[in-house]
């Protein structure tokens, strides 16, 4: 069984076995009746083929040792029946008749279509190779001359100089029979069309032509996004510097959507009403403000400074016994 066929299911296999058992049972009963009531001279312990031969001899048929069967009074057929082709030599006494005609229509002409671009048409054209008038004239003459050979086909189905049968393998001299070669001249390709025809990839961005951006002017104020407005221009500076930057005019935003942090300064909240409140403008107690000198730096709470109070010599390694601590 080839790999392209479908495997039968379990139920289908069971049905096939059941039908085969029934056929064998019927055939066994038929041959049993022929053996019992046929009065044939059969050899001892013979198979069913001998019973079938005796039945054919009684009915007027001759069965050769190789299985060739034909009627009495007729000569043995010269050629045996071809199972695949379905054709055999015609015999007046044979039990089978050959097919009167083939199942396909023979091609009246060649299987190649004539076109003005073909090499065989070069001698039919005139001096002007671009003109189609000589080709149309030759097409009409070809169709009229071959109409008699295709009388079995309707006029609207006939293809002049062609075939409606299966395609024929081209000869070795034909360009279509050769292996197609890959074009290695990559310099002649149009890169702009090659890039635009490629589907976009998450890991590769297509850079369009520079002419697309020739007439585009980037605005100074761009709609704010959370990634730009979370970090101020001077995140660890004083409040006065942020206020002076806001009063001096609106800041310009860099066109770097992939960057964040201090590389892309944010618009102060005074210039952009939709922006989030920066860290320096947030309302917080003065003792927790970073860099403020009013109350000093934030002191550590109890238990934070562990390594500063005890030296390395005072530490003692124990096994967890409370009495040795």
From Swiss-Prot:
Pfam families cross-referenced by the UniProt entry: BES1_N (PF05687)
GO molecular function: DNA binding; DNA-binding transcription factor activity
Modified residues (Phosphothreonine): 169
Keyword Transcription among record annotations: yes
Stretches the record annotates as Required for DNA-binding: 6-89
Organism domain of life: Eukaryota
Region (Disordered): 1-21, 304-325
Single biological process term from Gene Ontology: DNA-templated transcription
UniProt entry tagged with the keyword Amino-acid biosynthesis: no
Record note on modification: Phosphorylated. Phosphorylation increases protein degradation.
Keyword annotations from UniProtKB, A to Z: DNA-binding, Phosphoprotein, Transcription, Transcription regulation
Protein family: Belongs to the BZR/LAT61 family.
Descriptive protein name: BES1/BZR1 homolog protein 4
Species: Arabidopsis thaliana
């Amino acid at each position: 069984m080839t790999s392209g066929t479908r495997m039968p299911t379990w139920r289908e296999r069971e049905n096939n076995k059941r039908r085969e058992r029934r056929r064998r049972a019927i055939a066994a009963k038929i041959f049993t009746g022929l053996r019992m009531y046929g009065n044939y001279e059969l050899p001892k312990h013979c198979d069913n083929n001998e019973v079938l031969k005796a039945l054919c001899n009684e009915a007027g048929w001759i069965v050769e040792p190789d299985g060739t069967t034909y009627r009495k009074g007729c000569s043995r057929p010269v050629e045996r029946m071809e199972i695949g082709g379905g054709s055999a030599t015609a015999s007046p006494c044979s039990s089978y008749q050959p097919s009167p005609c083939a199942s396909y229509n023979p091609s009246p002409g060649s299987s190649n279509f004539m076109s003005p671009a073909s090499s065989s048409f070069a001698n039919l054209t005139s001096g002007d190779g671009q003109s189609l008038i000589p080709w149309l004239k030759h097409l009409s003459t070809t169709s009229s001359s071959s109409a008699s050979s295709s009388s079995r086909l309707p006029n609207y189905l006939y293809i002049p100089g062609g075939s409606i049968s299966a395609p024929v393998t081209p000869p070795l001299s034909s360009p279509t029979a050769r292996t197609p070669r890959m074009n290695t001249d990559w310099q002649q390709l149009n890169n702009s069309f090659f890039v635009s025809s490629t589907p976009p990839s998450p890991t590769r961005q297509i850079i369009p032509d520079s002419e697309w951006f020739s007439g585009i002017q980037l605005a100074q104020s761009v709609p704010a996004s959370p990634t730009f407005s979370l970090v101020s221009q001077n995140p660890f500076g004083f409040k006065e510097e942020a206020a002076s930057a806001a009063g001096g005019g609106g800041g310009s935003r860099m066109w770097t959507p992939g960057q964040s942090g201090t590389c892309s300064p944010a618009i102060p909240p005074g210039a952009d009403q939709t922006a989030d409140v920066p860290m320096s403008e947030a309302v917080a107690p003065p003792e927790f403000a970073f860099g403020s000198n009013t109350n000093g730096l934030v002191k550590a709470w109890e238990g934070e400074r562990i390594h500063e109070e005890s030296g390395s010599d005072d530490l003692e390694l124990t096994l967890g016994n409370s009495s040795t601590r």
